Amino acid sequence: MYIEEVKGEMNLPENVRIFDTTLRDGEQTPGVALTVEEKTGIARKLDALGVDTIEAGFPAASPGEMNSIRRIVELGLEANICGLARVLREDIDAAIDCGVDYIHTFIGTSPLHREYKLKMSPDEIIDRAVFGVEYAAEHGLKVEFSAEDATRTEFDYLVEVYRAAEDAGAEIINVPDTVGVMIPRAMNHLVSRLKEELRVPISVHCHNDFGLAVANSLAAVEAGASQVHATVNGLGERAGNAALEEVVMALITRYDLPVDIRTVELVNISEFVSKITGVRMPPNKAIVGENAFAHEAGIHVHGVLEKAETYEPITPEMVGHKRRIVLGKHTGANALRSKLQEYGIEMKEEQFCTLYEQVKRLGDKGKRITDADLRAMAVTILGKASREIVKLEGIAVMTGESVMPTATVKLRIGDEVKTTSMTGVGPVDAAINAIQSLVSETADIELDEYNIEAITGGTNALAEVFVVMSDGEGNKATGRSTREDIVMASVEAVLDAINKILSLK
């Protein structure tokens, strides 16, 4: 409604290209280091998603980086494969040796970079930029040029640098907000002015230091920028980059702009990248977070059940997500009835009231209630014995100063008894690894969360272990156990969760 009223004030491009830099800037996330196989796996996913350009890495960084980029080039993907390079002959040669068809070359231009990092005069920087762009263009590469720290560079000088790069053969001019200092109105103003000065398309690369990377990217598009740099899940240096999934969905649904992205794959690639990098997404992460389409409050759930649009701006299916009705202290009776109906569970009113009170009571205690937990509670109230599909028959653990922690576990799975031994970083890890190994033939169930808390003091303190486990079908279950023995408490909690998940099948 209100967006339509202001669209006339925007200088929107005909379409927006997505330049993905997950494999370059995203890999610079502190603590993230990807193998060749992991990088090629992500590249395949990005290509299937439909991004226009994949920045595969920084070829001059190391021989291993060059090898990764070569492997990605050899995949023969639809996307342009780009390499990052400083405006140096050796950097550009490294990119050429990798076989990329696109180069993103840069040099710092702000007073800070000129004086402290580069120790070069403004004219020297322009000369270096021109050399780099010309050298890359002469070798048949498509050239995108960035003035690093552009948003802290004097405007007249910035235009001078960009025009020189443009005249030297740059086909795209990129505006990096290198340390995320811009606000949307300022970014819009800057890009609008640059559009008046330059001939080639303008791109933006926004960092998220103040949480404004996506907003600044969209503000640039409103001013006419036709390409956005982004990363899956917003990965990147410090606070990260503009999140690809957020930029894409905003462009498509808020601006009605054509973007060649298969949006139904967004959750899939988000989870894939999260798993490979080890960077977990907050549950409330926009578009792809676990809670992006989750509803607990009774009023909200009632509205969503009547018409999803009341509390959802887009359908979860559009991005490959699922709507979830979450149970907790804010849950209303309608939500609970809907959940029971979903699982085909029928209850008398008295039984329903008992279950409803239990849900509220657990919610007030801050306990998480998964669908599998609900089903287990309902089965108990209905007087039906819950199936203990996996039962512990025996366990022995060995650990010590010079001994690899090892656990031997015997489980009864259905009518079959199985035994295995596994190692781990400690006896608890070894025991859980052994259980997962034995159960893997029945179902692919993974440990998502593990928490332990001492309830009492002393060396014989009671420990409460809480776990969250999930399978490949999106089912989650919690498990709890309280024991003096931490290993046994952990084993019982894991088996509790596993049995809840298996009971859903």
UniProtKB/Swiss-Prot annotation:
GO terms for biological process: L-leucine biosynthetic process. One of its GO terms (molecular function) is metal ion binding. Pathway: Amino-acid biosynthesis; L-leucine biosynthesis; L-leucine from 3-methyl-2-oxobutanoate: step 1/4. It holds the Pfam family HMGL-like. Residues 16-265 form the Pyruvate carboxyltransferase domain. Its cofactor is a divalent metal cation. The keyword Transferase applies. A divalent metal cation binds at residues 25, 205, 207, 241. Keywords: Amino-acid biosynthesis, Branched-chain amino acid biosynthesis, Leucine biosynthesis, Metal-binding, Transferase. Its EC number is 2.3.3.13. It catalyses: 3-methyl-2-oxobutanoate + acetyl-CoA + H2O = (2S)-2-isopropylmalate + CoA + H(+). Belongs to the alpha-IPM synthase/homocitrate synthase family. NCBIfam families: LEU1_arch, PRK00915.1-2, PRK00915.1-3. Homodimer. Catalyzes the condensation of the acetyl group of acetyl-CoA with 3-methyl-2-oxobutanoate (2-oxoisovalerate) to form 3-carboxy-3-hydroxy-4-methylpentanoate (2-isopropylmalate). This is Probable 2-isopropylmalate synthase.
